[in-house]
């Protein structure tokens, strides 16, 4: 029996974004292409051609172009994807040929079979290039973080370095773009432009973790009419870096009236008299949940957010199909790959000629000098 191909949750999300961004303005059910796209991560070289041919065949069978105006709209969307095609000459040959077919309606109608074949090839070219680039970067990231050939101290250090590197990526790059604020440059003012991309990413990783950008984003969402009352996800994810000083501040508003309310003596609690049993149970449940997360008892990694419908990537507000599904998603993946490489170089062990000593610690070993 053939071994089951490894799957990547990250790539499942990324590939769906890529497919939907490329097929925007095209009347086609993208589910089959999305299912094929997911197979390109950890895909043996012998199977890639079959998967890509499956994508082309789906396009060939389902894509219809009614008029030249529709074709022009599709081409306007596809133009920006040229940056992620390894052979730009191929891209522009197909793209410019399709442009020529929009010269007159009669010419368009006469050449429609050729137009469809050309468009299907262009779409397949873009999808296969972007998906393979994304798969390579996701594979690198996951293999770097999941590598078993590490000491526990190195693994812990790398996971924490990567966690806060991603937090800075969100705070200094993604959130400012979403709310329309200028992106902060990682380099110091007065310095010459950084030619080494790795050095630029390194400086991004070294920027302060505590910023006001999350609060600024909440203000932005509030002005747009988005409910921001449930922000537990940002605390759990470690993005909203704040110390909670008073529990009452983060409980439902009714708890804040405790100081001005009469205490229910027979219930031996500090709840005001106008709170019913259902509200008391809800407050108790919230406290229990918070305690489990704060003490590490609940470590399932599940995170929900008021910024999403908690269903699919397409329900993001206000990101939706505007940012995550643009071609820039590959730029974010590339930044993450460079981050992972920088973290690896920073934490790789060097041979210092010492002696490895086994100790009764979860970290198991330490290095000592030869004496």
UniProtKB/Swiss-Prot annotation:
Q: What the entry says about post-translational processing?
A: Phosphorylated on serines by F10 kinase, phosphorylation state is regulated by H1 phosphatase.
Highest taxon above the source species: Viruses
A GO cellular component annotation here is: virion component
Where's it mainly located? host cell
Q: Which Pfam families match?
A: Pox_G7 (PF05503)
Q: Cellular location of this protein?
A: Host cytoplasm; Virion
Q: Does the keyword Isomerase apply?
A: no
Q: Does the keyword Phosphoprotein apply?
A: yes
Protein name as catalogued: Assembly protein G7
The record lists the organism as Vaccinia virus (strain Copenhagen)
